[in-house]
């Protein structure tokens, strides 16, 4: 799929309620294979790789901002031609929150997996960004693609209460950094269910895809059609 002259790798399968899957930083759409297999009946599953990840194009540095990525996500959501369920892991969860703020009418429900809402304090954002940049130097990723994982402001966390879509929160028992975000989501979002997966870490959707898929299936079954 071409979005603004950048080819985005998209996988689609099934028919029914459209679900858009957005992975985390330095991952790709195959992270969702196990979950999608479990949700093969009754759902139109659409997984994509963020620009600079997986089989998607890697444009030059300066083309990986939040707005660039949200622009790609918008075009993918529009493929569904109806409100979608957004499922996001880590960075993908943050981007899904941002998308909800920009296009609330396009979102039926939201599933946040090992995700965070960003940071209010500039000092904390700078610490996070420094950690991302340091990690990027040690990784085999396209130049500049780490920009997608940087936090430039507190817009998302400051605006959480504006999101009205029903939410499912999933986190691994051992993922302490992102487990702390659960209380924030419960305070500001319409969280219908929170699931802690025993023994799981940050990649809960990969290693415990059955538990994650079952939680999503249960959550969507109780939502109005």
Regions found by a protein language model. Name each.
Residues 144-159, 174:
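Active-site nucleophile elbow and catalytic-triad environment of alpha/beta-hydrolase enzymes
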Residues 68-84:
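Conserved acidic catalytic loop of the alpha/beta-hydrolase fold
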Residues 94-102, 108-136:
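Flexible "cap/lid" loop of the alpha/beta hydrolase fold
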Residues 86-88, 113:
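Short beta-strand immediately N-terminal to the catalytic nucleophile in serine-hydrolase-like folds
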Residues 9-57:
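Conserved HGGG/HGGXW glycine-rich cap/lid loop of the alpha/beta-hydrolase fold
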Residues 200-209:
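Catalytic histidine-centered segment of alpha/beta-hydrolase-like enzymes
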Residues 163, 169-171:
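Short beta-strand/loop motif that positions the catalytic acidic residue
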Residues 176-181:
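Conserved alpha/beta-hydrolase "acid-adjacent" motif
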